[in-house]
Amino acid sequence: MLQMHSNSSFSPKCYYPLQHAGCVKTLQLPLTKVHGGLNRSESKNYAIKCTQSDSFYSTNKIRNNENSSSRNCKPFNKYRVAVTLQQQDCASNNEDDINSTSFRDVLLKKLHALYVFTRPFAMIGTIVGITSIAILPLQSFADLTPKYFMEFLKALLSAVLMNNYVGTVNQVADVEIDKVNKPGLPLASGDLSVGTGLAITLILSLTSLAIALSLQSPPLIFGLIVWFLLGTAYSVDLPFLRWKTNPFLAGMCMVIVFGLVYQFSFFIHFQKYVLGRPVVITRPLIFAAAIISTISAVMSLLKDIPDEDGDKQFGYQSISSKLGKENVLRLCVYALFFAYGVAVIVGASSSFQLGKLVSIIGHSTLAFLLWLRAQTVDLSNNASTYSFYMFIWKLFYAEYLLIHFLR
């Protein structure tokens, strides 16, 4: 007798020739996959019971069915192997893509952190300022020789590196304060480690001084050494240093660097050691030193307004916390109005008609824009006060363009 019962899985039971009649043997056959799915048509249990006389016949029949099933499944097994290999290749490719994307993202993040670490707005100010001062000693297009351009690039590079040193050493010294005032900066946010920042700072300063020494220009070497010392004294927290906590000393540092070092050290370098002419202090140079010094003093006062919260938390008494934000803002705006008024008078006294016109209109326009911008400042909003501070940097850039029309 042959008895079959349908169940949820395939489990044939049969008597083998060497078994006694009436015993049961369970045979579990593997389920096959058809294009990634189970062959549901074979997913049944078969209970096979054989007598002694027909056990051999039943066993052979089951084996024949197994062989037939195996033959029928060969094409599907072949497809299954192909699909498996294809899946492995896809997984490998996906992993490579993920690793490539991850490396690219990390690299771009580090490069952006380095860019922010250099304080690009100050670097742009250095490029504009040094370029403008380098043009002042020129008397004709014949002065624009290949040697002049090479010496200009070397001097500009030394200035940019020193400017970056001053900005980065300030961030290294202010990591904890910047976590409150400027959490987006690389060291404060953790995008760069303090060790990495310190290493970059040292490389910048040493490279800048090395370039200056290679140029063998005493005014340039002197100017960069003064710049280095003042930048260090401004930020480093050592006895008798960290001058940024003192409003007078902080303002003095910025006035000396931007108002004097920029103008006189680099002007004399280009005039005497690049062009080979005797030193002659010109009217535009004196005017540039005066008005840039005023703008620098204003920037030293305004930069503390958005940082007042962090300064108070760490016990620093900035001028805005002593006098009040509104009074400091008013003082800075009035100082710039006075400077632009003087600039208009000086421009009006010029014998160069085009220069007179440009100087009067240009400085009047800057004063008007300053007045409009000052009306929109929200002293209770740090983002607003910082935006106004950045606007003063734009006035700084513009002044280096206008000084060339004062003859």
UniProtKB/Swiss-Prot annotation:
Transit peptide: 1-81
Cellular location(s): Plastid, Chloroplast membrane
Cofactor(s) annotated in UniProt: Mg(2+)
Homology family: Belongs to the UbiA prenyltransferase family.
Name the record gives this protein: Coumarin 8-geranyltransferase 1b, chloroplastic
Signal sequence interval, chain numbering: none
Annotated catalysed reactions: umbelliferone + (2E)-geranyl diphosphate = 8-geranylumbelliferone + diphosphate; esculetin + (2E)-geranyl diphosphate = 8-geranylesculetin + diphosphate
UniProt keyword annotations, A-Z: Chloroplast, Membrane, Plastid, Transferase, Transit peptide, Transmembrane, Transmembrane helix
Species whose genome carries this gene: Citrus limon
EC main group: transferase
EC number assigned by the record: 2.5.1.138
InterPro entries reported in the protein's UniProt record: UbiA_prenyltransferase (IPR000537), UbiA_sf (IPR044878)
One GO CC term, this protein: chloroplast membrane
